[in-house]
């Protein structure tokens, strides 16, 4: 099973080693979640200013955030499934603020690597349809996040 991952660090502040770690973690999560082989996802690391603009434009929230996901393979109400479209899905985009990652790592007293991994998995689970709008959804999603991160070896310190 292999996920096709395109990772871009627009800030130039995240090491190649750390970007590779994100790729490995997402491959691990995709395998554990049974994601279709050759499914595609993009990860973009941006500044607080950039994610602030994205958050304002697409979510109507005038503040920076840590991670935003844009799922591309959601069937909307009234849409029909395309017969014969067996192409691997394009799951969507995960956008992570490098600045917020650093701030939150410090705030929660754990490593940048752990926080970046947490945010990548959080965004990835959103692409797979998980959410945290209700207490039940939040419990399911956050339990899944913790299980994946712990199994991968990125436990909270």
Curated annotation (Swiss-Prot):
GO cellular component: cytoplasm
Cofactor: Zn(2+)
The keyword Nuclease is annotated on this UniProt entry: yes
Class of enzymatic activity (EC top level): hydrolase
Keyword Mitochondrion belongs to the record: no
Ligand binding (Zn(2+)): 122, 126, 132
Cofactor binding annotation: Binds 1 zinc ion.
Signal peptide: none
Documented EC number(s): 3.1.-.-
Localization (cell): Cytoplasm
Entry-linked InterPro entries: MetalPrtase_cat_dom_sf_prd, YbeY, YbeY_CS
GO molecular function annotation: metalloendopeptidase activity; RNA endonuclease activity; zinc ion binding
Cysteine-cysteine disulfides: none
Top-level lineage group: Bacteria
GO biological process: rRNA processing
Keyword annotations from UniProtKB, A to Z: Cytoplasm, Endonuclease, Hydrolase, Metal-binding, Nuclease, Ribosome biogenesis, rRNA processing, Zinc
One Pfam family of this chain: YbeY
Family, per entry: Belongs to the endoribonuclease YbeY family.
General function of this protein: Single strand-specific metallo-endoribonuclease involved in late-stage 70S ribosome quality control and in maturation of the 3' terminus of the 16S rRNA.
PANTHER family: ENDORIBONUCLEASE YBEY, CHLOROPLASTIC
Listed name of the protein: Endoribonuclease YbeY
Gene designation per UniProt: ybeY
């Amino acid at each position: 099973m292999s996920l096709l991952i395109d990772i871009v660090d627009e800030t130039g502040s995240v090491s190649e080693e750390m970007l590779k770690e994100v790729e490995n973690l997402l491959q691990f999560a995709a395998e554990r979640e049974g994601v279709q082989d050759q499914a595609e996802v993009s990860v973009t690391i941006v500044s607080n200013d950039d994610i602030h603009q994205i958050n304002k434009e697409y979510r109507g929230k005038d503040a920076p955030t840590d991670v935003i996901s844009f799922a591309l393979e959601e069937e909307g109400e009234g849409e029909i499934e395309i017969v014969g479209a067996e192409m691997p899905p394009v799951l969507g985009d995960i956008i992570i603020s490098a600045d917020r990652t650093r701030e939150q790592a410090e705030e929660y007293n754990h490593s940048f690597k752990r926080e970046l991994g947490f945010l990548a998995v959080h965004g990835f689970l959103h692409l797979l349809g998980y959410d945290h709008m209700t207490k039940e959804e939040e419990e399911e999603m956050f339990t899944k996040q913790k299980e994946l991160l712990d199994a991968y070896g990125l436990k909270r310190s």
